Amino acid sequence: MLFVGTALQLFLGAVNASLLAYPLGIVLAANYLYLLILISFNKEKWKWTAHFTGRATYITSLTAMLVLTIIFGLVRQDGAEGAMGALGFSQMKNSWTFNIFLLHFASVIGVKSIDDLRNIKNQKLHTAVMHTAFFIILLAGIFGSGDKQRVTLTTIQGEPTNIGVAEDGKKTELPFIIRLKDFSLEEYPPHIHIYADDNLSKEHIIIKEKGDSATLGKWHIECKEYLEMAGCKPGDSLYRPMNHVGATTAIHVRATAGSDTVEGWISCGSHIFPGSALQLPDGQMLAMPRREVKKYLSQVEVSTGDEIKNFDIAVNSPATIGAWKIYQSGYDNARGRWSTTSTFECVKDSWQPATHAAMWLILAAGVFALFANRTKKKRK
């Protein structure tokens, strides 16, 4: 299989998963499953089926997949050329070698699952269920790969759109329209660093409110005024409260070290107001870098033609529209909390319900096995 996979990789190039797109993927999956059933029923008659049965085959196939998976993890998957690229190791999921071994491994598990189900009276129920569920995951992963779509869509607040960019860079029309209603962003409290020799110190202090104080290096720093939303007129160093687009965080601090005392404003700035630092007598400065983002959320309206739904989309909290999931993947970093654009990754995986069902079966089989073992111990 290694020789065949390498030869196909060198002569044909990477595997084109789009060839398995609906309906061909389902047709091939059905025929593949039928072939495995034939193998299970005729393994004693067909000698060549020994390549899919037996303990030695299980161990060999599993070991091969483990080795390839380790290579998958160690080699950067950037599609680079050269020797590694020619052999498919820099793009393993589209490598002939990897996919041939994966198909063989799935076939071994598939035949074993069918055997377990045929001899359910002689097999542990949870073992049969676990093998079958694992096979379903592999089947969906292989034959459903052509149906997976990833489309990146950038929306501007108030402007509905359904045109995104696919992985191949082509513009793609989505079966739904997204309109960004509002964007919100939550940040961690400001960090104050010492800036010297064009570098920020690793050591820092956190200021949350007026009256906070801490020591940074040799300087004792006290917050005299804290403005979450502030602005500064051009040419002025005084920050005033401002609830308007572009408002930034500004802190008035007093820094003391021995007989040296300085006061002034520190700000991280925004896309409108430049940041400001406090000059210290020793040539260093107190500076506030851009605040770290804690979480961000987009309130959107999604229209499918038949209905309109509202969603709050955040990282790890996607919206679901039919077979599509809409993930929050970015925003206008320059504008930060004042971003008027959101970037979404729209992912379609028609085989995902089968995968989810299989994972629940694995969980159920594990729980059943746990209680079954406890019952046996009690009987003994």
Located regions from the model:
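Solvent-exposed, non-transmembrane regions of integral membrane proteins
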Residues: 1-380
